[in-house]
């Protein structure tokens, strides 16, 4: 691990806020318009809010198919909702104050064929819990990521998540 933070890290609050505000529009255009049937944009926003920010893990069963297939950072691959729940809980244990914001949602598809989605997000938190990144350091971290989902029948059946885990580890190590 790095002995010091790379140039530009940690970002100051003004830079971070400017980057977060660069997503436009801040709310989805369709939010003002009622959508008949399944609203994929609202579904994804509810998922991220309920699971990542409110930590209502019971809702995972509403959003995900039990046989979920997942691929994520550092070549994580597994099948089954219970493995996904373990992964989410391990991140939340490591970063108990993690707050996630959706920057953009892109999607294509329909109710018959299903949807392919891409959600660009950012998060801030403190590495203050036990976890896979070593002893807690109380390091403030900033994470940028993309989560892609395949949604069929109102359930997420495949998820691909990407964030720079090496950058995250560098932020944690730089505060030591």
What do these predicted regions represent?
Residues 1-176:
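C-terminal and inter-domain tail/linker signature
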């Amino acid at each position: 691990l790095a002995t010091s933070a790379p140039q530009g890290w940690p970002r100051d609050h003004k830079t971070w806020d400017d980057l977060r505000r660069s997503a436009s529009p801040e709310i989805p255009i369709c939010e003002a318009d009622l959508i008949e049937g399944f609203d994929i944009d609202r579904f994804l926003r509810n998922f991220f809010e309920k699971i990542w920010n409110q930590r209502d893990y019971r809702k995972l069963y509403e959003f995900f198919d039990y046989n979920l297939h997942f691929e994520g950072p550092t070549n994580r691959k597994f099948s089954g909702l219970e493995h996904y729940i373990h992964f989410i809980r391990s991140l939340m244990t490591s970063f108990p104050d993690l707050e996630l914001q959706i920057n953009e949602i892109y999607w294509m598809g329909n109710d018959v064929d299903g949807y392919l989605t891409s959600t660009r997000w950012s998060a801030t938190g403190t590495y203050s819990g036990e976890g896979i990144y070593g002893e807690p350091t109380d390091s403030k971290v900033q994470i940028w990521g993309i989560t892609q989902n395949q949604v069929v029948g109102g359930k997420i059946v495949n998820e691909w998540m990407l964030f720079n885990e090496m950058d995250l580890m560098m932020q944690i190590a730089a505060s030591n």
